[in-house]
């Protein structure tokens, strides 16, 4: 923080998806790039791709929006709030100033990641990968890690705390919560002026951002006579399907890219 001369903590300003896109535009200008042929993003990245088409329509030809939503539901906001509370109630969070105290809210951040990771998977994928498999031959009737799924979630949480900052996680979830471009008073003017071609992709087993959420964006674009293609890809991968190998998924993107 240039004003205090100390590391940013909880005093770092809350940012929005629009802020991120604006900063990316500054980087684009500094790199001397005149136009993006494609802006591609999944989940929160998909929201940024959509925002690019709204805020900088003259600088983007095509947007591929994957496993995203035009705004979060109450359920999604609730998941984010539980994750934030897990972090903020960790004593080592230190009011957000843990770096100055030479601490790290690892327990809270690990819990937040465990919760989030559950929402990224589908019930079917978890059943197929873990079921009710035990780590040992018999149930111990105690509170140790007994089921394989428990072990997996703890591993994901422990791994995450070594690669991600807790306050950044808080800011990221808030950016997700606040995203709602349709509520922008300038939305009609923005979407009316964009000439971007859109591809929306959703996945059948994604319950965090289900196909119906992508279809909301598709219907909005159609209502404004925009060029939009849409594919709902069959997958058991849940929300994380957008990160997984899937021939049909790749074919949809490849065809769109080759034709544009």
What is each of the regions a protein language model found here?
Residues 1-47, 54-81, 241, 260:
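Gly/Pro-rich cap/lid or specificity-loop segments adjacent to the active site
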Residues 59, 65-159:
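Alpha/beta-hydrolase-fold enzymes
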Residues 155-156, 171-190:
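Active-site nucleophile elbow and catalytic-triad environment of alpha/beta-hydrolase enzymes
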Residues 159, 176-179, 204-209:
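Acidic catalytic loop of the alpha/beta-hydrolase fold
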Residues 183-187, 210-220:
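Short alpha-helix in the alpha/beta-hydrolase fold that links the catalytic acid
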Residues 191-195, 221-224:
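Short, conserved loop/helix-junction motifs that constitute active-site signature segments
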Residues 194, 200-202:
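Short beta-strand/loop motif that positions the catalytic acidic residue
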Residues 215-218, 222-260:
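Catalytic active-site module of serine/aspartate enzymes centered on a nucleophile-bearing elbow/loop
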């Amino acid at each position: 923080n240039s004003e205090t001369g100390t590391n940013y903590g909880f005093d770092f300003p809350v940012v929005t998806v629009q802020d991120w896109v604006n900063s990316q535009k500054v980087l684009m200008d500094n790199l001397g790039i005149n136009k993006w042929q494609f802006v591609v993003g999944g989940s929160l990245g998909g929201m940024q791709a959509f925002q690019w088409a709204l805020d900088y329509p003259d600088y983007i030809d095509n947007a591929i929006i994957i496993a995203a939503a035009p705004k979060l539901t109450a359920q999604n906001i609730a998941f984010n709030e539980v994750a934030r509370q897990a972090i903020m109630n960790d004593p080592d969070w230190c009011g957000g100033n843990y770096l100055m105290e030479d601490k790290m809210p690892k327990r809270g951040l690990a819990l937040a990641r465990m919760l989030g990771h559950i929402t990224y998977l589908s019930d079917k994928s978890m059943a197929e990968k873990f079921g009710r498999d035990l780590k040992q031959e018999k149930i111990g009737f105690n509170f140790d890690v007994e089921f394989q799924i428990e072990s997996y979630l703890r591993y994901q949480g422990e791994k995450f705390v070594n690669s991600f900052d807790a306050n950044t996680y808080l800011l990221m979830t808030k950016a997700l919560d606040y995203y709602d471009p349709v509520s922008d008073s300038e939305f009609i003017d923005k979407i009316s002026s964009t000439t971007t071609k859109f591809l929306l992709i959703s996945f059948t087993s994604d319950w965090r951002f289900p196909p119906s959420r992508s279809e909301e964006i598709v219907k909005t674009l159609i209502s404004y006579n925009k060029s939009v293609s849409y594919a709902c890809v069959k997958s058991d991968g849940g929300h994380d399907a957008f990160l997984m190998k899937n021939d049909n998924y790749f074919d949809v993107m490849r065809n769109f890219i080759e034709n544009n």
